Amino acid sequence: ICNGQWTSVGSAGLYYTIKADSMCVDIHYTDGFIQPSCQGLQVIGPCNRYQNGPRDFVACQTSGGSGHPICIQSTNGNIELCANCYCPQ
Protein backbone atom coordinates (compact mmCIF):
# COMPACT_ATOMS: atom_id res chain seq x y z
CA ILE A 1 0.00 0.00 0.00
CA CYS A 2 1.42 3.32 -1.05
CA ASN A 3 1.97 6.38 1.05
CA GLY A 4 0.33 9.65 0.11
CA GLN A 5 -3.06 11.26 -0.17
CA TRP A 6 -6.19 9.54 -1.40
CA THR A 7 -7.95 11.35 -4.24
CA SER A 8 -11.56 10.43 -4.94
CA VAL A 9 -12.64 9.92 -8.52
CA GLY A 10 -16.17 9.21 -9.69
CA SER A 11 -17.17 7.78 -13.04
CA ALA A 12 -20.66 6.81 -14.15
CA GLY A 13 -21.69 5.81 -10.65
CA LEU A 14 -18.44 3.96 -10.06
CA TYR A 15 -16.30 5.60 -7.41
CA TYR A 16 -12.77 4.78 -6.41
CA THR A 17 -9.78 6.48 -4.86
CA ILE A 18 -6.22 6.78 -6.03
CA LYS A 19 -3.12 7.26 -3.91
CA ALA A 20 0.38 7.72 -5.28
CA ASP A 21 3.88 8.06 -3.96
CA SER A 22 7.29 7.84 -5.62
CA MET A 23 7.02 4.11 -6.23
CA CYS A 24 3.44 3.07 -6.80
CA VAL A 25 -0.19 3.91 -7.26
CA ASP A 26 -2.96 2.28 -5.26
CA ILE A 27 -6.53 2.00 -6.50
CA HIS A 28 -9.12 1.59 -3.76
CA TYR A 29 -12.62 0.62 -4.82
CA THR A 30 -15.73 1.33 -2.79
CA ASP A 31 -16.05 -2.37 -2.01
CA GLY A 32 -12.75 -2.20 -0.14
CA PHE A 33 -10.61 -3.95 -2.72
CA ILE A 34 -7.16 -2.43 -3.19
CA GLN A 35 -5.23 -3.04 -6.39
CA PRO A 36 -1.57 -1.96 -6.55
CA SER A 37 -0.03 -0.55 -9.67
CA CYS A 38 2.51 -2.27 -11.87
CA GLN A 39 5.86 -2.53 -10.15
CA GLY A 40 9.00 -0.85 -11.41
CA LEU A 41 7.35 2.47 -12.18
CA GLN A 42 8.00 5.67 -10.27
CA VAL A 43 5.33 8.34 -10.03
CA ILE A 44 7.02 11.65 -10.82
CA GLY A 45 3.98 13.83 -11.27
CA PRO A 46 0.45 14.37 -10.01
CA CYS A 47 -2.46 12.19 -11.02
CA ASN A 48 -4.97 13.90 -13.27
CA ARG A 49 -8.41 12.98 -14.50
CA TYR A 50 -9.34 13.15 -18.16
CA GLN A 51 -12.75 12.64 -19.71
CA ASN A 52 -13.16 11.65 -23.33
CA GLY A 53 -16.74 10.88 -24.22
CA PRO A 54 -17.84 7.77 -22.31
CA ARG A 55 -14.26 7.09 -21.25
CA ASP A 56 -12.84 8.32 -17.98
CA PHE A 57 -9.09 8.30 -17.43
CA VAL A 58 -6.82 8.93 -14.51
CA ALA A 59 -3.18 9.28 -15.49
CA CYS A 60 -0.03 9.63 -13.41
CA GLN A 61 3.24 10.70 -14.97
CA THR A 62 5.83 8.02 -14.34
CA SER A 63 9.43 7.14 -15.03
CA GLY A 64 11.10 3.76 -15.11
CA GLY A 65 9.59 0.72 -16.72
CA SER A 66 8.01 1.75 -19.99
CA GLY A 67 8.18 5.42 -19.04
CA HIS A 68 4.56 5.84 -20.07
CA PRO A 69 1.89 7.21 -17.75
CA ILE A 70 -0.03 4.84 -15.56
CA CYS A 71 -3.56 5.00 -16.90
CA ILE A 72 -6.74 3.90 -15.21
CA GLN A 73 -9.50 3.65 -17.79
CA SER A 74 -13.12 3.39 -16.75
CA THR A 75 -15.58 2.52 -19.49
CA ASN A 76 -19.06 1.16 -18.84
CA GLY A 77 -18.16 0.37 -15.25
CA ASN A 78 -14.94 -1.44 -16.06
CA ILE A 79 -11.54 -0.25 -14.89
CA GLU A 80 -8.22 -1.22 -16.40
CA LEU A 81 -4.91 -0.37 -14.80
CA CYS A 82 -2.04 -0.51 -17.24
CA ALA A 83 1.44 0.90 -17.54
CA ASN A 84 1.60 1.09 -21.31
CA CYS A 85 -1.68 2.39 -22.63
CA TYR A 86 -3.03 5.49 -24.30
CA CYS A 87 -3.87 8.41 -22.06
CA PRO A 88 -5.34 11.61 -23.51
CA GLN A 89 -3.07 14.62 -23.29
Swiss-Prot record:
UniProt modified residues of type Glutamine amide: Q89
Domain of life: Eukaryota
Alphabetized GO MF terms: toxin activity
The protein's name: Mapacalcine
Claim: Chloroplast is one of the keywords in the record: no
Free-text description of this protein's post-translational modifications in UniProt: Contains disulfide bonds which may also be involved in dimerization.
Keywords recorded for this protein, A-Z: Amidation, Disulfide bond, Toxin
Assembly behavior: Homodimer.
Biological role stated in the UniProt entry: Blocks calcium currents via interaction with a yet unknown target protein. Has no effect on L-type, T-type, N-type or P/Q-type voltage-gated calcium channels (VGCC). Has no effect on voltage-gated potassium or chloride channels. Blocks non-L-type VGCC calcium currents in mouse duodenal myocytes (IC(50)=0.2 uM). Blocks calcium influx induced by hypoxia/reoxygenation in rat hepatocytes.
